[in-house]
Amino acid sequence: MAVRKLWKTVVQLFSKSKSEECNTEAGTMEVSCLKYGVQGLNADCSYVKSQCIKLSECECLYTFASDVCKEDFHNSEEMKVFVVQHSQEIVGGTDFSVHAEESV
């Protein structure tokens, strides 16, 4: 459950992009994670990256997806640490814990 909540928060951060295509791809990644868990992202990785790499607005989402796909998370705590570190880099130091608490 914690992983789903964290991923949803990350997707929400990226979905602020003005690009409709990028928002759609963020949704695709969210659905994949909710259905199959963190490991399920691996199945969708090539598709998501192939779509996002075409969009300059989607660069940070593409980078994050690439990083997530390289990781092999054994539990939600590992996922949390990784997501927090990377989301702060990507969104310029946004307090991720605040966003996570607001997300339901």
Curated annotation (Swiss-Prot):
Keywords: Host membrane, Membrane, Transmembrane, Transmembrane helix. It is found in: Host membrane. The chain crosses the membrane at residues 37-54. This is Protein U9. GO terms for cellular component: host cell membrane; membrane. It comes from Human herpesvirus 6B (strain Z29) (HHV-6 variant B). It comes from the Viruses. Its main location: host cell. It is a single-pass membrane protein. The keyword Cell membrane does not apply.
